[in-house]
Swiss-Prot record:
Catalytic activity reported: oxaloacetate + ATP = phosphoenolpyruvate + ADP + CO2
Native source organism of the sequence: Bacillus cytotoxicus (strain DSM 22905 / CIP 110041 / 391-98 / NVH 391-98)
Metabolic or biological pathway, per its Swiss-Prot or TrEMBL entry: Carbohydrate biosynthesis; gluconeogenesis
Entry's cofactor comment: Binds 1 Mn(2+) ion per subunit.
PANTHER family referenced in this protein's UniProt entry, alphabetically: PHOSPHOENOLPYRUVATE CARBOXYKINASE (ATP), PHOSPHOENOLPYRUVATE CARBOXYKINASE ATP
Cofactor(s) essential for the protein: Mn(2+)
Name of the protein described by the UniProt record: Phosphoenolpyruvate carboxykinase (ATP)
Keywords assigned by UniProt, alphabetized: ATP-binding, Cytoplasm, Decarboxylase, Gluconeogenesis, Lyase, Manganese, Metal-binding, Nucleotide-binding
Length: 528
């Protein structure tokens, strides 16, 4: 099937009598309720369940092996290849399936807040609530922009269409397949809305570096003086909590590009975790869950329609999707200058990494490639004690290109724009998990504040004798002894042993990066 035939099939689908294009939020909410796809909650949000898939399905994600991308993609377990023939057959079947539906829902918008680099996108949904989700999460167009909405990358989403692995070449009934040549993402067999969000992110992670733009899995905010900060970190490291600051405006909570102009948000909304959400802990997120917002897999009381954010009966991965302008303290459009400060967050359960340290360019590249944190008991089945986990560039499931490409771009941009980089450990102090205690949040906030204010630029530091990190000897509002992790342990020998153990895990993980500059390893990695 040629690209032309693919577009003809899509054109027929979009022009069918069942296609509902660019419905407003109230219209979509009505559709969700009329079609029994979800419930209205007490705050006016829509609550929907995603069935058996309550998270992403990384083993069901494929990229079509096409001539134009075959030599560019880092093929492997993250980027699994599928043939053009298999894609074409499955695509045809999905289109035929959707043509028979009574209603389809179409959203047209953009990914990328910088007009110079934005990607026109359109999403064809079997479900109205999925269409509401993408309407809130991506960038919504003006009438004028809609009239000039050309050559979009299209997501075709059919959750109730199940693949047959024996026939279709998939690994299960679920599939997420990207064709860069045909500019199509085909999703089926899963109702988890996050697949649509992350498909567009994966696409931007391929397209942006081709234009010399670094795509990043991070949150970003800007201070009153226009100073920009990026926060990288895996789940549970405090990225959302620490980047929500009353004195700084949010650029975005999850996905950004860094171009020659500065930083821009890839999205037009937020996809926040809801587990144990409360107004006291996270008022911005709590208050954003109102009419038009989407709650995913959150238990809602049948009578009162009040959401119970502590109930994990369906999953711990409960989510809320809402437009970024549901938050007061934001920058619109979601663009800003070059980052002054970059913060890598890690929740080190071994309790050996300093609570804050300054990184050189090589150390920044090393820790960016490592993407270290600890998985804690209860976050995944089978995890009974904390495990070191490494997610390349803090976002390995979404990187189509070789990881070194992203790291090199980061290094170049840090050098060019003189960005200061810090590694902040929000994990354990005074011993490993089970012995020590979690880092005091007030201290972490004070350290982040000092980094952002430039108070650590000239402070005296000491080199960590195992990790080679520059550890500040003093941070305002933080006791000096907290800054030196070994001083918080009762047993110094046990500290050293644990630190060497973690350093060895870093080294072992880094062996997979066989094509990175030796400087990154020699100047950026552990010294012991």
């Amino acid at each position: 099937m040629s690209t032309v035939n693919v577009q003809i099939g899509l054109h027929e689908l979009l022009n069918g009598s069942n296609a509902q294009i660019q419905l407003s939020v109230p219209q979509l909410v009505e559709k969700v309720l009329m079609r029994n796809e979800g419930k209205l909650t007490s705050t006016g949000a829509v609550s929907a369940s995603t069935g058996k898939y309550t998270g992403r399905s990384p083993k069901d994600k494929f990229i079509v092996k096409e001539p134009s991308v075959a030599n560019k993609i880092a093929w492997g377990p993250v980027n699994q290849p599928i043939s053009e023939e298999r894609f074409n057959k499955l695509y045809t079947k999905v289109l035929e399936y959707l043509k028979e539906k009574e209603e389809l829902f179409v959203f047209k918008g953009f990914a990328g807040a910088d007009r110079n680099y934005r990607l026109p996108i359109q999403v064809v949904n079997e479900y109205a609530w999925h269409n509401l989700f993408v309407h809130q999460l991506f960038i919504r167009p003006t009438e004028e922009e809609l009239a000039n909405h050309n050559a979009p990358f299209t997501i075709v989403s059919a959750p109730n269409f199940k693949a047959d692995p024996a026939v279709d070449g998939t690994n299960s009934e679920a599939f997420i397949i990207v064709s860069f040549e045909k500019r199509i993402v085909l999703i089926g067999g899963t109702e988890y809305a996050g697949e649509m969000k992350k498909s567009i992110f994966s696409i931007m992670n391929f397209l942006l570096p081709e234009q010399d733009i670094l795509s990043m899995h991070c949150s970003a905010n800007v201070g009153e003086e226009g100073d920009v900060a990026l926060f990288f970190g895996l789940s549970g490291t405090g990225k959302t909590t620490l980047s929500a600051d009353p004195h700084r405006k949010l650029i975005g909570d999850d996905e950004h590009g860094w171009s020659d102009n500065g930083v821009f948000n890839i999205e037009g909304g937020c996809y926040a975790k809801c587990i144990n959400l409360s107004h006291e802990k996270e008022p911005q997120i709590f208050d954003a869950i109102k009419f038009g917002s989407v709650l995913e897999n959150v238990i809602v009381d049948d009578k009162t329609r009040i959401a119970d954010y502590s109930d994990t009966a369906l999953t711990e991965n409960t989510r809320a999707a809402y437009p970024i302008d549901a938050i007061d303290n934001i920058v619109l459009p979601s663009v800003a200058g070059h980052p002054n400060t970059i913060i890598f967050l890690t929740a080190d359960a071994s309790g050996v990494l300093p609570p804050i340290s300054k990184l050189s360019k090589e150390q920044a590249m090393y820790h960016f490639l490592s993407g270290y944190t600890s998985k804690l008991a209860g976050t995944e089945r089978g995890v009974t004690s904390p495990q070191a986990t490494f997610s390349t560039c803090f976002g390995s499931p979404f990187l189509p290109l070789d990881a070194s490409r992203y790291a090199e771009m980061l290094g170049e941009k840090i050098e060019k724009h003189d960005a200061k980089v810090f590694l902040v450990n929000t994990g354990w102090t005074g011993g490993e998990y089970g012995v020590g205690k979690r880092m005091n949040l007030a201290y972490t906030r004070a350290m982040v504040q000092a980094a952002l204010n430039g108070e650590l630029d000239k402070v005296e530091t000491v080199k960590h004798d195992i990790f080679g990190l520059d550890v500040p000897l003093h941070v305002p509002s933080v006791p000096d002894e907290v800054l030196m992790p070994e001083q918080t342990w009762a047993d110094q020998a046990a500290y050293k042993q644990k630190a060497i153990e973690l350093a060895n895990q870093f080294k072992e993980n880094f062996k997979k990066f066989d094509n990175v500059s030796k400087d990154i390893i020699n100047l950026g990695g552990p010294t012991a």
